[in-house]
Amino acid sequence: MDNQQDKVIAASANGENNLINGVKENDSEEQDVAMKSFAALEASTPIQPIPVVQKESPMFPRGLLPLPSKKPCMQSPPSPLGLIEAPDHSATGASVNAISLTSGVAKGLNTWSLPNECEKAPFAIMEPAGISALNGDCLMQPSRTCLGCFMESKEAVDPEPGISLKVGDLNRDYETCAVSDIGIQCINAGENLKYGEQLLSDQLLGFPLHKSRAGDRRESEKPDIDLEDPTQKSYYEALLLDKCNTEEALLANSNQDWGYFETFISESKIELLDLCSKNELSVNLFSEEDVENYMFDDDESTLGSDVCSLKIRYESFQDNVRDKTTLLMQEDAQFNFFPSVFTTCPKRESKSGVLKQSSDLSQFKVPDVSIIWGDEDKNLDKKKGKEEVHEDKSIEKKDEKDNGEKPALNNKPCSGLEVEQFKNLKPDHLTNSLETSGNFSDDSSFIEVSYDAMGEIKDCSRYMARDTNSGSSSSQQNYGLRAKRKVRYSEDYLYDVDSLEGEKVNERKEWPPGGSKEEDDDEWCPKKRRKVTRKEPPVIIKYIIINRFKGEKNMLVKLGKVDASETTVNLSESQLSKYAKLSPLKGFWQKKKKQKNGNTDSVKTPFCQKQSFEPGSFEVSFLPPARKRKSKLGNRHRIQRIQSMEASASSKQVSFGSDQKQASNRKEEGGLKGTPKSALLAAPSSANGSHLRGLIGPDSAKVKAQDTEFKGPERKVLNKIKFKSEARLKSKKIKTGQENKPVVQMSPVSEDPSSKANLKNEVTPGTSNSSHMSEFHETKVVKNSTFLPTTCSSEMPLSSANVATNIPVIPGGYLQTLLDASDLSNNTSISYFTNHSAEQNEASLSQTEKAFAPLQSAQDCVLSSSSDSQLQQSSQNFKMEASNYGSLWPDKDTSGSQEFMTEVSGEIATSQSSEFEATQVVSMENNLTAITYSPVCLNSGGSGCNKVLYASVQDSHLAPDDSYQLCHFNNGEICFPFQQGPISTEDDGQLFSFDSMTPLSVSSSSYCPLSLKSCEKDGDDDINDDFLAHCSPKLVIQQSIDEIAPLKESTDLLDISNFTPDKFRHSSLSEMSPPDTPSLSPQSTRCESIKTLGTMKGFQEGVPGSLSSMEKIKWDCSTLSQQVQADDGFTLNNHQFQFHMFNDEDSVGLLQKNPCLSTFDEPAGQISANNKVSKSRKKTSPGKSGAVSQSSSQKNTRKKSPKASNKGVEKPPSKTSRQVPKSAKKGKYVAAVNGEKMQIGIGHSGGQPNSTSSNGKTLTECIQHGGPVAPMKIPSQKGLSGDWALGKESRPGWNDMSVVTNTNNLLDDDQREFQEPSYILSNIASGMADVQRFMMASMEPLWEPMEHQGESNTFYSPDSNSLKLKTLKILAGTPQESKKKINNGSSGATKNHRSIKAVSKSSGKAAVGDPGHADVSGSSEDSRSAFFDKKYSNMNTLGNNGPTHKKLYRHKSSSKTLRDEKYKGKRVEREQIHKDEAGTTCFEKLRGSSYNLLKAETAFGVLPVFEEETHIFQKDI
């Protein structure tokens, strides 16, 4: 109440001022009342006192104001009642003036907290002393939000009509306005309202005041137009005071008021800025240091940031202002601006004794302000004296200032001069106060008052602080409050505050306030520093700018001193050279860069040359940048194929040994696979490519290499050209191929030697002696005996490269690759196959040639249906010939392969790994069979030939294995044939080759059609589906995307694979456009299979270590192949799972199962279910008890997984049973158990059991394939991580099983993916990791293709053929033992991979459910594992055996969760039903999960059966 009393004193002083100004005592009393009311209003709204001041100021000279100031000095201690009563009389303008000053002081008072009190208290008390006028602030309190309430009551009491009108107008305005509005609007509505309100309202508020206020403003303006400058000054003072009052009033409810005021400030911010910009005063204020002060003031409260002070303070002010009243807050804001100006000016004025701010204010209200300020100073001093007392409670400064301010106020008001000085100061001070709200310097008492008033309400102090920043209205009271606040506000006020405070303190002689100001100064000084610091950013910016131009990385400039004495320079050559040395031109660095690049290229070129690729082509494939280029991925794949093929051809031409060395070196250097791939690649290159490249190989290889070279640096342009160049090469190769084809055919028709000679002489290096290839293989095996799988893998890449060369895989799209493959199929492809055939025999070559004749048309048709039928016929012919060819070829090739295998075996030190050694070095027995794939690859060379070889291999596994091995190596050159061959000794191998090659076939277009045709021999429907799907945009695109995605960078793999599988899944394959597929599929497929095979081979070579990577790559290849196959085989499945298509292809690939495959395609559901059930039963029956028990074990524990692995594999999981059936059973069981246990979450701990399982599965597959898988399984159990060994074996040995398993895995995994969100996440993670691995593999596809061919063919075949072969073997007519073995091995592999996936996922359940967990645990897991091992083998390491992309995508659909649930149920059912029921349940649930949409029946026809079997195996395991 002391503050209120001070306000009352100020009000009474104002009342006397009114009298002095010639206004009646009553008027003065009324004015006092008005002052009170205004003080109250000011407490709520800074503007109100100003209107009164405007009127009063004109009425009485400044000189009178000091007297009233003295009078308030006398009335300094009025009681709150007096204050309350006084407002009735202070309704007069003089009172208002006093109040405006008072309200500044009263602002510190609890005017708002005393609203009722104000109304209750008679104004009469205030009337005589004018102290009541200060309590007029309290009168505002009746309606804290509306001064109008107070003004109304005051107006009712107001005897002075003139003032009463003004006050009444204010009251009306107040009624209209909220407290905030009252503060600004109502006060503006006061006598000062017209000018100040209009000015502030229009400028600050950006909107007119209330009509009542406008009317009052007009009324006051009419009599006081001349006084507008003083009035404005007083108005601004009032604004300041009002802000103080408003703050005070608001401070009564400081939280509300301040928040409201702050909100108002933010709201009025823009308006205030507009007004300030519009207002002359505001312009001056803003233009001057005041702007900074204001900025700093407002910023002080808000951010305390000098740079942002203006804006921030303005924002803060407006936030508060609009909360309170837009007008009030805007006025406050303007006063914040003004206070900055005023504060700055008063500080200056303090020094000069003139109100510089008054000058600024005087623009509108300098005289009035001076008078009012003097008066107000008195009133404020008195008020502050009281407010000080009141405020002392809140703040030390307040106390300090109160003590000093009271005497200062009392003294100042008492002495007219001092009052006048203070008056001058006061406007300044108010201005300063507003700005110095934190400053107590100018008017310590006033600051005290505001501080005290604010002190009463600590929120007020906070509010005042904000107000100081936000608005100047809180200047006086806020000053008191901001005395401390000012320290904080000093940030904003910084400079102004210090200077103002110093000046104000000196001028006002507010010693205690000076002390408080010193405190402020102390704080302010640091804030000044802060402000100075804020000005540093330009320096920072400068440095930033400078840093920008510090120079480029390579902008090395040799600074040389130029002879300044040389006024003229002769630009002679010597001088130019000198200057050139001083500052070499861009050309110099360009040359350097070119040289550097040339060196790099030369370094890279040897790698390419090592594989006999064109440096550019090979370079592009191997260059990490090329890999990193997603857009170049397809090209890289194509390049890889081309380079591999060229390398194969070149190697073959040059010398198998040297090329082999180069290839292996290059592969070792360039690829993950390293030497193994190189060896494999070189071997096929030498064997297949020597003459082939001599004839077609060199031409196509060179052309392709050139294209690829172009493509490397100009890949985009070349990509555009690639179709043309591919077509051109295709035409060439078609012609050459046709020419060579007859030669090749004639050569094969001729005896092998002549045929070989012809082939060697001609462009059909494929027809080159199988002995030659065997020699090379042997040489390479001898050289890389340990790396024989690598040799196979290298050959695989070379096979792909040769296929690319033969099918000059121009950087063009997949179609051109297909076309080139078609041409090369007839020409180079035959040569490749012929190389395989060469190893196999000339008859096989002839068969291959025959196959290629249809194949060429088929591939020329880009896998057209007629081509497909041709391929079928060709495959049939080849198959028919295959028997002969198999007999011939197995004899020769087997011998050659066996020699090779023997050497390899010696090298690898595995019993029968020679043939399969390409696939797995560790287990030579079964691997020997796998290695015999190479002859199969000859048949693979002609898809029919591969089929025949497969038939032969099926018939005689060992011999076919030899052929298979040759096929491996030949596939090294022709990724597909080898894959076909090695994938399944039976048709599975071919189907695998088809599937694996399907991408590769797509790459080397003839192979895919050939493979498809080969597969389609037995099942035209499947082949048509596969072929059509393969040829169809869906299949092609899917293959290309799936294949390319893995080959692309990890991002590409993830992006393309993730998006493509889902895209293919969700969009029918037909929706995919073949053009996309051509560009992606050939390269990705081939590269992927090459990479995968190469990786597999590398892993197989170093089975334990490499196998993991190999398996990953293998799985990737399988995934790609399977996806391609899924496209080919099942559009729906491909849609769901690209591997479904591969399943069909696998079915097609399985020659033995081809009838079933055809049946599968047509009555796929029935036959698949039946076959799957029977197969799963068969698989289960071989180790049914083990499978069932292992199923329990799987679920129960991983312990049983090892047991089951031992069971399935022979008891030692690490020791692969040599007995193929037992191994197969064990592999199956182990795979199931391992997969199951891995699914259980045992992860890789059962890796060796999984390894055993994988080995067993692989062995089973190998046995089925003629024993190549068994050695693989053995090596897996021996040293290969079970999963990886199985992955390798599963891929090569898996062909049937892997296809089936992949099919089931696709479905099951997809469903499981839907079923298990965690599995999805795990799949995503593992998929990404696998993608990266696959990317790594895809980074080295050049040598990988060889490996791919050597062993990866098996892997890739397991990718494609695993699903289909397994499906076909399970469903189709594959021998039960083979089926069982394949399924078992596949299941083991699948489970291993799934187990790995489960481990990675740390979700055994997910792993178990990965395949969709059909009760066909064996088949489902085989399918799934094969699939996962293939596609997710890379991801499998991460723990995702399922289709990474699908998982990544399919997890998007809720169906995966459903599938997870279903899968869980299925698992239970599976365990319960184990076989048919499980398979049926899985099938049903898979359908239920809408996994297979359109082709679900077809795909599930195969897949559910496999799932059933897989599930059975899982359970059995």
From Swiss-Prot:
Residues 381-416, 505-529, 644-697, 732-775, 1065-1084, 1161-1228, 1372-1422 are annotated as: Disordered. Residues 381-405 have a biased composition (Basic and acidic residues). Its main location: nucleus. GO terms for cellular component: cytoplasm; nucleus. The keyword Nucleus applies. InterPro entries: DUF4683 (IPR032757), Nexmif (IPR042794). It comes from the Eukaryota. Residues 678-687 have a biased composition (Low complexity). GO terms for biological process: negative regulation of cell adhesion mediated by integrin; negative regulation of cell-cell adhesion mediated by cadherin; negative regulation of cell-matrix adhesion; negative regulation of neuron migration; nervous system development. Involved in neurite outgrowth by regulating cell-cell adhesion via the N-cadherin signaling pathway. May act by regulating expression of protein-coding genes, such as N-cadherins and integrin beta-1 (ITGB1). This is Neurite extension and migration factor. It comes from Rattus norvegicus.
